[in-house]
C-alpha cells in the first residue's frame, strides 16, 4: 500500500477516534468510515477485519522488541473485540468506534502481525567442506565392512540383521526423497508450504499396499516341506543361483579360490580369506595370490568391472547430493548422509560378495570397492561448487529420482528376494515381515523427525 494512503488512513482513524471528544467533525468522520466499511453505520468483526486489511495492517519488517509494547502480538478483529469487552456478535456504532480505535492505530503503526525474520544464513565454506568430507569418509568406511562381516554371513541370525538394514535403507532413501530432496528441488519450505502431511500420505500409500500384499501372501501361501513354499508362480524376485567359486589356474602346484566360502574344504585360510589347497603333497607353498596381486585381471569376470564402474557412478551422485545439501544447511546434509549411509551398508556388502564370486581375491575386492567409493569425494566437490555458485535444485531433483529408484526398484525387490530361501514356515515368514516393517518405519520416522524439527535443531 502506498505511504500516502497509509497516512491518510491513520489520520482518518485518528479523527474518528476523537469522536467522543469532538462530537462535530469526529462524529462525521466516524460515520464516513462506518458507512464505507460497515453497514447501517455499524461494524461487525468481519467488516473490521476488512478495514484493517484495507488500511494496511499487514506484515512489515521492524517489529518492536518484546517488552516495549503492552500488546506485542498480532490481534485479529475478534481479539480486539474481546479485549474491549465486546462479543463477536457486537455491532460497533459511532459511540463505540472511538473505544477500539487506539487498538486499530497500534496494529497499523507497529505491524506486530509480521513474523520476525529468521536470518537463514548458509553454513560457512569451512563448515561445508569439513562436515561434507567427514560425512563422505564415514560413508566410505562402509565399503570396508565386507572384510569384517564376511565371517558372519553363515551365521543363522545374519539374514535377519541384513533384512533390517535393507528395510532401513528403503525407509531412509524413500523418505529423504519425498520429504527433502524433491520438495527442495521445487523450492518448497516445510514450515511455509505445509507439504509434510502430503508427503506422509505418499509414504502411507506405499506402506499400506506393501502391508496388505504381504499379509495376503502369508495367509494364502501354502508352506511345503524342506522350507519350500507353493503359491502358483509366487516368486519374490528373479531366481538366482549361487555360482560355485571359480578355481583359478594352478600356480606352483597351488590352486587359489577367490570365494572365501571354500575355505571349509581342507585348505589353509590366509588373512585375505584366500584358500590355498595343495594338489601335490598337501605342503603349503608361497602363493602369488597373496597381497593385492591375486588372480590376473583378465581372469576376473566382466560382472566385477560392471559392478565397480556402476558403483563409482552411484557414489559420485551420492557425493553430489551430500555436497549440495551441505551448502544449503548442515542439517539437510546430515539427513542426506544418514539416508546414503543406511543404503551403503547392505549395498557395499552385496557388491563385495559379487566381486568375490566374480573371481577377485578378498584384498582385490576390498581395493576396487574402496576405489569406487572414493568417487564420492569427487561428487562432493562438484556438489559444493555447484551449490555455492548456482541453485542446486537440479542436483536435488536428480538425487531424489535416484533415491526413489534405488529404494523401490532395487532394494525393495532385494529385500523380498532374501526371504525365498530363508522362509521355512508361516512363523518364520511373519518374523521376517516384522523385521522389514521395523527397518522401514525406523528410517521413515528418523527422516520425518529431522524434517519436522529442522528449524529447532542447530548444528554449531
Curated annotation (Swiss-Prot):
InterPro entries: ZIP (IPR003689), ZIP_Transporter (IPR050799). It is a multi-pass membrane protein. Residues 1-22 form the signal peptide. Glycans are attached at residues 40, 88. GO terms for molecular function: monoatomic cation:bicarbonate symporter activity; zinc ion transmembrane transporter activity; zinc:bicarbonate symporter activity. It is found in: Cell membrane; Lysosome membrane; Apical cell membrane; Basolateral cell membrane. One of its GO terms (biological process) is leukocyte adhesion to arterial endothelial cell. A motif (XEXPHE-motif) lies at residues 343-348. GO terms for cellular component: apical plasma membrane; basolateral plasma membrane; lysosomal membrane; organelle membrane; plasma membrane. N-glycosylated. N-glycosylation is not required for proper iron and zinc transport. It is linked to Congenital disorder of glycosylation 2N: A form of congenital disorder of glycosylation, a genetically heterogeneous group of autosomal recessive, multisystem disorders caused by a defect in glycoprotein biosynthesis and characterized by under-glycosylated serum glycoproteins. Congenital disorders of glycosylation result in a wide variety of clinical features, such as defects in the nervous system development, psychomotor retardation, dysmorphic features, hypotonia, coagulation disorders, and immunodeficiency. This is Metal cation symporter ZIP8. The gene is SLC39A8.
Amino acid at each position: 500500500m502506498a505511504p500516502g494512503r497509509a497516512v491518510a488512513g491513520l489520520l482518518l482513524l485518528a479523527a474518528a477516534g476523537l469522536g467522543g471528544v469532538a462530537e462535530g467533525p469526529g462524529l462525521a468522520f466516524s460515520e464516513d468510515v462506518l458507512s464505507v466499511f460497515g453497514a447501517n453505520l455499524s461494524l461487525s468483526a468481519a467488516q473490521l477485519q476488512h478495514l484493517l486489511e484495507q488500511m494496511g495492517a499487514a506484515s512489515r519488517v521492524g517489529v518492536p522488541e518484546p517488552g516495549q509494547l503492552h500488546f506485542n502480538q498480532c490481534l485479529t478483529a475478534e481479539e480486539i473485540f474481546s479485549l474491549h469487552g465486546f462479543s463477536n456478535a457486537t455491532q460497533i456504532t459511532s459511540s463505540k468506534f472511538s473505544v477500539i480505535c487506539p487498538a486499530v492505530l497500534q496494529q497499523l503503526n507497529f505491524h506486530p502481525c509480521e513474523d520476525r525474520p529468521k536470518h537463514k544464513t548458509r553454513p560457512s565454506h569451512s563448515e561445508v567442506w569439513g562436515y561434507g568430507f567427514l560425512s563422505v569418509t564415514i560413508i566410505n568406511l562402509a565399503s570396508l565392512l565386507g572384510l569384517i562381516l564376511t565371517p558372519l554371513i553363515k551365521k543363522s541370525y545374519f539374514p535377519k540383521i541384513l533384512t533390517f538394514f535393507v528395510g532401513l535403507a528403503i525407509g531412509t532413501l524413500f523418505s529423504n526423497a519425498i520429504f527433502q530432496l524433491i520438495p527442495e528441488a521445487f523450492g518448497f519450505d516445510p514450515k511455509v508450504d505445509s507439504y509434510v502431511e502430503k508427503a506422509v500420505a505418499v509414504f502411507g500409500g506405499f506402506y499400506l499396499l506393501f502391508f496388505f500384499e504381504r499379509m495376503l501372501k502369508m495367509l494364502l501361501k501354502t508352506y511345503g516341506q524342506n522350507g519350500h513354499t507353493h503359491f502358483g508362480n509366487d516368486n519374490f524376485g528373479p531366481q538366482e543361483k549361487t555360482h560355485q567359486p571359480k578355481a583359478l589356474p594352478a600356480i606352483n602346484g597351488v590352486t587359489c579360490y577367490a570365494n572365501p566360502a571354500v575355505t571349509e574344504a581342507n585348505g589353509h585360510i590366509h588373512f585375505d580369506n584366500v584358500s590355498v589347497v595343495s594338489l601335490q603333497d598337501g605342503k603349503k607353498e608361497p602363493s602369488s595370490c597373496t597381497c593385492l596381486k591375486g588372480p590376473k585381471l583378465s581372469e576376473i569376470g566382466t560382472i566385477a568391472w560392471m559392478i565397480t564402474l556402476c558403483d563409482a557412478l552411484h557414489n559420485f551422485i551420492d557425493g553430489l547430493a551430500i555436497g549440495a545439501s551441505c551448502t544449503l544447511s548442515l542439517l539437510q546434509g546430515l539427513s542426506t548422509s544418514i539416508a546414503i549411509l543406511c543404503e551403503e551398508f547392505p549395498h557395499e556388502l552385496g557388491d563385495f560378495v559379487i566381486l568375490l564370486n566374480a573371481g577377485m581375491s578378498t584384498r582385490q575386492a576390498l581395493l576396487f570397492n574402496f576405489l569406487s567409493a572414493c568417487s564420492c569425494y569427487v561428487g562432493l566437490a562438484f556438489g559444493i561448487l555447484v551449490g555455492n555458485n548456482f541453485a542446486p535444485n537440479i542436483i536435488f531433483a536428480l538425487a531424489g529420482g535416484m533415491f526413489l529408484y534405488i529404494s523401490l526398484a532395487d532394494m525393495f525387490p532385494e529385500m523380498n528376494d532374501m526371504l525365498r530361501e530363508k522362509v521355512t514356515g508361516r512363523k518364520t515368514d511373519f518374523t521376517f515381515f516384522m523385521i522389514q516393517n521395523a527397518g522401514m518405519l525406523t528410517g521413515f520416522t528418523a527422516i520425518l523427525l529431522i524434517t519436522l524439527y529442522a528449524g529447532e535443531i542447530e548444528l554449531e
